[in-house]
Amino acid sequence: MAKFIFITGGVVSGLGKGITAASLGRLIKSRGYRVTALKFDPYLNVDPGTMSPIQHGEVFVTEDGGECDLDVGHYERFMDVNMGKGNNVTTGKIYSSVIAKERRGDYLGGTVQVIPHITNEIKSHIRRVAEDSDADVILVEIGGTVGDIEGQPFLEAIRQFKNEVPSKDDVLFIHVTLVPYIAASGELKTKPTQHSVRELRSIGIQPDVIVCRSDREIPKDLREKIALFCDVPPEAVIPNEDLGSLYEVPLAMEKEGLAEIVCRRLGLDSRTPDLAEWEALVQRAKHPEREVEIALVGKYVALEDAYLSVVESLNHAGIHNNARVRIHWVDSEKLENGITPEALEACLGRADGILVPGGFGYRGIEGKINAIRYAREKGIPFFGICMGMQSAVIEAARNLLGLSKANSTEFVTDCKDPVIDMMAQQKQVTDLGGTMRLGAFPCRLKPGSKAHAAYGTEVVHERHRHRFEVNNAYLERLEAVGLKAVGVWPEGNLVEVVEMEGHPWFVGVQFHPEFKSRPNRPHPLFRDFIKAALEYRAGKK
């Protein structure tokens, strides 16, 4: 029988429940157990695919094409386990399933209600993930904060779930809460935690472990106070103070004994964790030998979480290259409207590498094109992802081929030279949600290319999220001016990778390599991009 760990949050949102779940998953896996994770999001959207990145952060794409919450990315990176569509479920998805069953007559004319029908659907999904994953331990994160109206069905479902498992030792509840510091009085306050736990207990859930987030060390006497008022053992009050890196969190939690408490409470054999690789990783991250600066040119830079996996992939590559990656955030809109060469130089001149990530819509696109031209002409390492690659194609068409009206039909439907066009199979699609080219597809790389050298193999599988592609009608002319197609989808001759001939490192990819990077196994393209940026930096001195 699998074991289930339910993780809830209190006081405020954004405390790091996902990092807590991911870190604990890593610690349990390091003891030789199979783990997986499931995130419940209480919003009514069926998935985050159509949500604004500025509101929600990035959409993480799984191998099977699931458009998921960014916490699923944390799960994959920390646990080094591929997740799928089923590992992120929203209220919208639960209600859609229940309503579809009602329309089919599955409820035999019964009155469909939140209890038991919605809660049963939630519990059914938890069991399905357990069966499909064959994991020993399933970590289930409940999004939002205890007390939110939207989250009530999920909390009720997990309360019921505990009463339905064969043994009470099969379920454990962890509550992540805030212990704020009040500067005026110079004190850490436990009252918000007490009230949050009281709210949780009022619906029938008694936490077994309380993880206390704070910006500083929590003294022993305050931990004992929380234990007393919240009815948990003192050792089950786990401090989780701010650290220099996310990757330090598993080691900090191991030091506090979280995994041992969890294993003991769930009746799992105590095993010695194998964290040597993770410890070495953290040490390299804390003591880099050099620095490199990357200009990240995007339209969603107001919220850094919109590019979370890109940032983490840069960090992974930096760790591998013994370098601290400093990101210079550049709003692509500020590079538009006839920006002068001097202003462009002032904005991008200090960069050792320029990265243009994915995105949608025309806003900011001209600024991205200006940044790409700057990288191409100055010989600065460039990495374009999804729209970043498409922007590189438009830049080459305009400034090397002389097609001044070159554009994407995403922005100008009747443009004179549509060097980027909608994929044929997308032209009849009307709904936006879940209809893009999603998930992992093969790509065949050309030997001798930088991409082939990075991967060390001819066929790779990468994750996608797009509707538009390079228009092959322009490919021969683009290649004639130096923009080479060095990677294609074998089944449809779709251009997946382009490189600029004669440039030190200029690579654009249609896929999203950031979704497959791991702290201990950086993505080959990010690894080589940072290496090229370091070489460029060394050459400037």
UniProtKB/Swiss-Prot annotation:
Single biological process term from Gene Ontology: pyrimidine nucleobase biosynthetic process
- What cellular-component terms does GO give this entry? cytosol
General function of this protein: Catalyzes the ATP-dependent amination of UTP to CTP with either L-glutamine or ammonia as the source of nitrogen. Regulates intracellular CTP levels through interactions with the four ribonucleotide triphosphates.
Active-site positions on this chain: 386 (nucleophile), 512, 514
Q: Please name one Pfam family that this protein belongs to.
A: GATase
User: What are the protein's GO molecular function terms?
Assistant: ATP binding; CTP synthase activity; glutaminase activity; identical protein binding; metal ion binding
The EC code for this enzyme is 6.3.4.2
Does this entry carry the keyword Plastid?
no
* Ranges of residues in domain Glutamine amidotransferase type-1: 293-539
Q: Which residues bind ATP?
A: 14-19, 71
> Which pathway, per its entry?
Pyrimidine metabolism; CTP biosynthesis via de novo pathway; CTP from UDP: step 2/2
Subunit annotation: Homotetramer.
According to UniProt, the reaction catalysed is:
UTP + L-glutamine + ATP + H2O = CTP + L-glutamate + ADP + phosphate + 2 H(+); L-glutamine + H2O = L-glutamate + NH4(+); UTP + NH4(+) + ATP = CTP + ADP + phosphate + 2 H(+)
Positions bound to UTP: 13, 189-194, 225
Q: Which parts of this chain are annotated as the region Amidoligase domain? A: 1-268
Q: What is this protein called?
A: CTP synthase
Binding locations of CTP: 13, 148-150, 189-194, 225
Q: Which UniProt keywords apply?
A: ATP-binding, Glutamine amidotransferase, Ligase, Magnesium, Metal-binding, Nucleotide-binding, Pyrimidine biosynthesis
What does the UniProt record note about how this protein's activity is regulated?
Allosterically activated by GTP, when glutamine is the substrate; GTP has no effect on the reaction when ammonia is the substrate. The allosteric effector GTP functions by stabilizing the protein conformation that binds the tetrahedral intermediate(s) formed during glutamine hydrolysis. Inhibited by the product CTP, via allosteric rather than competitive inhibition.
Q: Where does L-glutamine bind?
A: 359, 387-390, 410, 467
Q: Does the keyword Ligase apply?
A: yes
State any further remark: CTPSs have evolved a hybrid strategy for distinguishing between UTP and CTP. The overlapping regions of the product feedback inhibitory and substrate sites recognize a common feature in both compounds, the triphosphate moiety. To differentiate isosteric substrate and product pyrimidine rings, an additional pocket far from the expected kinase/ligase catalytic site, specifically recognizes the cytosine and ribose portions of the product inhibitor.
Task: Supply the NCBIfam families for this chain.
Answer: PRK05380.1, PyrG
